[in-house]
From Swiss-Prot:
Species of origin: Gallus gallus
A Pfam family recorded for this sequence: NuDC
CS domain sequence ranges: 177-268
Gene3D superfamilies recorded: 2.60.40.790
Gene encoding the protein: NUDC
Protein name: Nuclear migration protein nudC
Region entry Disordered, spans: 66-181
Functional note: Plays a role in neurogenesis and neuronal migration. Necessary for correct formation of mitotic spindles and chromosome separation during mitosis. Necessary for cytokinesis and cell proliferation.
PTM notes: Reversibly phosphorylated on serine residues during the M phase of the cell cycle. Phosphorylation is necessary for correct formation of mitotic spindles and chromosome separation during mitosis.
C-alpha cells in the first residue's frame, strides 16, 4: 500500500542532506546534477530498457509536471503574501502620515468642550480625595513593625522607580512618541516613522535623503540640515527596511528590528525617552511571531503587568507554589520563624 499525500510530504525532505551534499559537489549546477541522476539510472538500473517504449519518458514528464505545478503554486502564494505585506505597510504608512499631518495642523493650545472640562475637573477632584484618604491612614502599632518595614522597603523601591521615570514621555497610541518634527510608532518586531515636510511643492525621491544603516538613520531634504541624523536605539535589518513618500509631503520610514523581544524607549540617541512601562502590549501583533518567541514575549508581558501591580512574576509564583506544596507535605515542620526571599 502506497503512502498517503500527507505521509509523502512529511518524508519528502528526508534525503535532503544526501542530495544537498551531492549538489555541492557539482560545480556545473543543476544541469550537471540532473545528468548525474540519469547517468546513474542508465548504468545501474533498467530504467531506460526495462519497460515498454515511452514508459520511462512518461514517468519523467509526469514527475516534472507534478513538481512544476507545486513550484508555481508556492511562487504564487509567496507573491501574494509579499503583496499583502507591502499593502499593509503602505496602509500603515499612509495612516501614520495622516496622523502626523493632523498633528502638525492642530493648534498647540486646544480649547476644551464643556464635557471635557467637566471630566477633567472630576479626575482632579478624585485624585484630591484619594490623596486625603492616604494622608488619613492611621499609623500601625509596634507589633506590625515587621510588616511595616517590608512595606516601607517596597514603597522606597517604588519611589526610586518613579524617580527614574520622571521626565519620560508617555507613549502615544502606537507605543512610540509624537515629537515636534516627526512621529514614530512600534510593535515588538518593527517600527514606523512619519516626517511631514512643510514645503510648497510635491516631494519626489530626488528631493529627499534617506540613509538607513544597521545602527544609524538619516532623513532630510537635499541641501538642508537633516531632520534626523543619529544612532538608532538598536540594530535594524537594513534589507527588510524601506521608505516612501506619502501625499507628496510626508516621508515614511519602515524599520525591521533585529531584536524582536524589546521595546525601544527612543528612536535615536538624541530623542527624549518614553516610559516603556506604560506601553500597551496589545497593540503589538503577537501573531506575527513564531510560537517559541511568542510564548517568551507573553511571559515577559505577564511579568511586566504583575510587577506594575506589585504582584509576583511567573517565576516568583512558581517558587511560592513549590514552597507551599513542600510545607503541606511536611506539616510537622515549623516554618513560622523562617525567612524567605
Amino acid at each position: 500500500m502506497g503512502l498517503s499525500a500527507e505521509e509523502a510530504a512529511e518524508q519528502e525532505d528526508r534525503f535532503d542532506g544526501i542530495l544537498l551534499a551531492m549538489a555541492q559537489q557539482h560545480q556545473g549546477g543543476v544541469c550537471e546534477l540532473v545528468n548525474t541522476f540519469f547517468s546513474f539510472l542508465r548504468r545501474k538500473t533498467d530504467f531506460f530498457t526495462g519497460g515498454e517504449d515511452g514508459v520511462a519518458e512518461k514517468l519523467i514528464t509526469d514527475s516534472f509536471n507534478h513538481h512544476n505545478k507545486l513550484a508555481q503554486k508556492e511562487r504564487k502564494e509567496k507573491k501574494a503574501r509579499q503583496e499583502a505585506e507591502r499593502r499593509e505597510k503602505a496602509e500603515r504608512a499612509a495612516k501614520l502620515a495622516k496622523e502626523a499631518k493632523q498633528e502638525a495642523n492642530e493648534p498647540r493650545i486646544k480649547e476644551l468642550t464643556d464635557e471635557e472640562a467637566e471630566r477633567l475637573q472630576l479626575e482632579i477632584d478624585q485624585k484630591k480625595e484619594a490623596q486625603k484618604e492616604v494622608n488619613n491612614v492611621p499609623v500601625k502599632s509596634s507589633e506590625d513593625d515587621g510588616d511595616s518595614s517590608d512595606s516601607n522597603k517596597q514603597e522606597t523601591d517604588d519611589e526610586e522607580k518613579d524617580e527614574n521615570d520622571k521626565g519620560k514621555l508617555k507613549p502615544n497610541a502606537g507605543n512610540g512618541a509624537d515629537l515636534p518634527n516627526y512621529r514614530w510608532t512600534q510593535t515588538l518586531s518593527e517600527l514606523d516613522l512619519a516626517i511631514p515636510f512643510k514645503v510648497t511643492f510635491r516631494l519626489k525621491g530626488k528631493d529627499v535623503v534617506v540613509d538607513i544603516q544597521r545602527r544609524r538613520l538619516r532623513v532630510g531634504l537635499k541641501g538642508h540640515p537633516p531632520v534626523i541624523d543619529g544612532e538608532l536605539f538598536n540594530e535594524v535589518k537594513v534589507e527588510e527596511s524601506s521608505w516612501l513618500i506619502e501625499d507628496g509631503k510626508t516621508v515614511t520610514v519602515h524599520l525591521e528590528k533585529i531584536n524582536k523581544m524589546e521595546w525601544w524607549n527612543k528612536l535615536v540617541s538624541t530623542d527624549p525617552e518614553i516610559n516603556t512601562k506604560k506601553i500597551n502590549p496589545e497593540n503589538s501583533k503577537l501573531s506575527d511571531l513564531d510560537s517559541e518567541t511568542r510564548s517568551m514575549v507573553e511571559k515577559m508581558m505577564y511579568d511586566q503587568r504583575q510587577k506594575s501591580m506589585g504582584l509576583p512574576t511567573s517565576d516568583e509564583q512558581k517558587k511560592q507554589d513549590i514552597l507551599k506544596k513542600f510545607m503541606e507535605q511536611h506539616p510537622e515542620m515549623d516554618f513560622s520563624k523562617a525567612k524567605f526571599n
